[in-house]
């Protein structure tokens, strides 16, 4: 199964007014992704997703130039060999670091799709798992900085649909953040309420919200600080009283090794389209398992990442939640990839049953939605 071609498709679409949620990183104005196709000489085709990295054209160019030259001609079944070749040439020395990890993630995911198709197995079975239900929480670019009453209007139909956990966006300021959390907790006393500050907090902000987080039984506080701010994570862990979560902006097992050893973060959130692909997130999950830590992956833009994430969670022993994207009008979820991943009435999701990722990509969609330049979030 020699790799014959690798092609990246940077793609974008503008968000609708109702989908422009405000978060700690700004207000969403467009959605970006980098879809990756790998073809073999014997006619197999695999699809993956690389995160946009807020510069999808850059990631696409890296895949279509340097990384293509590194992987074309190699054995598509040798995912470890391909991963190591890119690591040696780009990640170990003088490479583009995070951009390479992101680009490699899309290629790696496509190679696992090919491996599954070659043997006729869904990815979860290929990884040693089974078709088991994976608990989901309502997340994605949604549940942002709305007034409490409007936020409750968003949460109610999600609970009615079966979700037993939701993630609220905080990071505006301690007072309005706590007001939103209190409103949701008051109406839904048994709901697992998770919160995400999208790196917008200071240690003093965490100190101010900590009593409220404990009072309202918040399940985790996600990314209060940027990923490199190890000192703030260590400080907040001493007093916050709820688990700290992070990982969507950490790359490869080498960065997760420090995250685990520091001991401040108790919920790990690698992204299969950022952290190094399926291959690397399996390693991260094994590392976390040795420390008795759950893995709750961050999901990216399209149904490719979403399908791969559910497959992986159905195959690792320390699986946590699947982050279900409940944002409005996400064409990458609803039109680019099929079939969809419906949430079951009990708030779980089943992995696709088809070979590989078990989903199909609409190439006409990619042709109709070229990349849109500029930032995806504005303040």
Map each language-model feature to its residues.
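Conserved, mostly hydrophobic/aromatic
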Residues: 3, 43, 67, 107, ...
